[in-house]
């Protein structure tokens, strides 16, 4: 994920360079028309993959991984429940503005899910939706449930939740800090928490890291995990005592972005740390961080929390039509890759896991 301070420049530069073809590259095939699918997540046990759209009006897409097709999943069903369980906002974001960044799912019933979406369109907020899935071939119908506004001056990045309704969101750069700062190892971000009954998000002391990025909670509800982008690491916190991290896992040769629980561990995806065709490591010039528009290779790694090892399970070299790998999902023998820069979702074979 990237800071909003670079967003407009990056979007205009990226849009201008986007190719028109949707033919496969050397190692990747594509579903096009996605408009920066920064974060992706599978609806468990189904063929459906949810993709965010990190651009104004891009919103959400629902991907049929069997048919290799995608459809717009926004605006939501107009007949959703009322009164809404999260009444802070009077109406859902405008479809023309909805800018979906990080996303997260939580099962709240036998066939019922809640979807959390970091939004930058029209307001800085966590938008909440619900939907049901069944055994039929029908696509699930999205229902808006309200929103949780972020404190003034803050832009969310990733989002996660606990089973008791607690919501966590990361902020990459707080006011007065920059991407160049976290590239130097300085603390720039934080994890903010909202609990049912509270009025607003508050900072969890001790979670201020160099570029707080992707976030995930543990199934046992005891820990959460945060990507420190400036450290190229995944950091573990005890949920109840956040004054300092409990563990830190350094990514092998890449810059993890989003993380997601996968079976008994985490998977992380991101661009390669050292890319010869881009002049090596990411740099700052005159205090400004390289926006990484030069196409870099990528890595996907599995973090074994029991053994404390992060091992690369897939990697790729730069591709002509795809850059900015930011998230991954494994469905069967297929690896899906999201991007904060590209106009498409990528997929490729992967050995069974």
Regions found by a protein language model. Give the residues of each.
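Short, conserved, GDST-rich strand-edge loop motifs in beta-rich repeat architectures
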Residues: 51-57, 117-118, 169-188, 269-295, ...
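Beta-propeller domains
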Residues: 19-20, 49-81, 134-137
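Beta-rich, blade/repeat-based domains predominating
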Residues: 33-45, 79-107, 141-144, 149-167, ...
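Short loop/turn segments immediately following beta-strands, especially the blade-tip
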Residues: 63-70, 129-140, 237-242, 305-307, ...
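Conserved beta-propeller blade signature
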Residues: 48-50, 114-116, 166-168, 223-226, ...
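Loop/turn-rich, solvent-exposed surfaces of beta-rich toroidal or solenoidal domains
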Residues: 253-318
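Blade-level signature of beta-propeller repeat domains, shared across WD40, Kelch, NHL, RCC1
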Residues: 324-353
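Beta-propeller blade signature
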Residues: 60-66, 123-135, 184-196, 290-306
